[in-house]
């Protein structure tokens, strides 16, 4: 079954261009010009990925990203203006998986979409070596069937990107993972100048949610998980 992409874009020409392009690429595509329209689509259909313009007429796209992350692990790629550097960083902090800037380069955008969908599918298929589908470390239980993290029975909310980065660490316990390798493991990007800041943001977010000393920085080399995994 084709992946379902929702394009949230209020500019008619851009919306039509994106819809045509991704339909030709073989995706199921829905379009809307508002956050309200997006919510209606998500209530009635299964959605794999959202292309979300942060400048919407009815609400702020960054606030919408945060609201989505509170109840969903759907893939989110923000569409921003070329000068909106702060918005891009805030968007990642609020749970977006990636971003692109206008004017859009469609070939790059489709690669980013394919790569995000690839890692979404990979995370869905991930299976641990334990019978109950959990990786256990330092009192935490990462369940790869339900895509959940718990400590002492208490759930810890993770965005999709946070979850996938944690999967990378628990499947490579004690191994130093460079920022470049983590970025490849997260998105397998094949575009020029991949944004390593994405890795830094995710590490900081995970450290805030986990014990701060679990993800250790090896200066000049990368990061590793300082815990036994079983």
UniProtKB/Swiss-Prot annotation:
It is found in: Cytoplasm. Phosphorylated and dephosphorylated by TorS. Keywords: Activator, Cytoplasm, DNA-binding, Phosphoprotein, Transcription, Transcription regulation, Two-component regulatory system. Changing residue 53 to A: Loss of phosphorylation. InterPro entries: CheY-like_superfamily, OmpR/PhoB-type_DNA-bd, Sig_transdc_resp-reg_receiver, WalR-like, WH-like_DNA-bd_sf. The keyword Methyltransferase does not apply. One of its GO terms (biological process) is regulation of DNA-templated transcription. Residues 4-117 form the Response regulatory domain. SUPFAM superfamilies: CheY-like (SSF52172). Member of the two-component regulatory system TorS/TorR involved in the anaerobic utilization of trimethylamine-N-oxide (TMAO). Phosphorylated TorR activates the transcription of the torCAD operon by binding to four decameric boxes located in the torCAD promoter. Box1, 2 and 4 contain the DNA sequence 5'-CTGTTCATAT-3' and box3 contains the DNA sequence 5'-CCGTTCATCC-3'. Phosphorylated as well as unphosphorylated TorR negatively regulates its own expression by binding to box1 and 2. This is TorCAD operon transcriptional regulatory protein TorR. It comes from Escherichia coli (strain K12).
């Amino acid at each position: 079954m084709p992946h379902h992409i929702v394009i949230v874009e209020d500019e008619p020409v851009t919306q039509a261009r994106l819809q045509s392009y991704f339909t030709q690429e073989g995706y199921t595509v829905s379009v809307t010009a508002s956050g309200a329209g997006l919510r209606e689509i998500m209530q009635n259909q299964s959605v794999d990925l959202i292309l979300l313009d942060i400048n919407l007429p009815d609400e702020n796209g960054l606030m919408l990203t945060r609201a989505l992350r509170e109840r969903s692990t759907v893939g989110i790629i923000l569409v921003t203006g070329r000068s909106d550097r702060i918005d891009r960083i805030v968007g990642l902090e609020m749970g977006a998986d990636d971003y692109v800037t206008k004017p859009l380069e469609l070939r790059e955008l489709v690669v980013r979409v394919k790569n995000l969908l690839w890692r979404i599918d990979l995370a869905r298929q991930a299976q641990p070596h334990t019978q109950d589908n959990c990786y256990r470390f330092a009192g935490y239980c990462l369940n790869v069937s339900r895509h959940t993290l718990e400590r002492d029975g208490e759930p810890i909310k993770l965005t999709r990107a946070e979850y996938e980065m944690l999967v990378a660490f628990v499947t490579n316990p004690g191994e130093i993972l460079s920022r470049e390798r983590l970025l490849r493991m997260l998105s397998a990007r094949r575009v020029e100048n991949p944004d390593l800041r994405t890795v830094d943001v995710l590490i900081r977010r995970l450290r805030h949610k986990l014990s701060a000393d679990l993800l250790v920085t090896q200066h000049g080399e990368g990061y590793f998980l300082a815990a036994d995994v079983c």
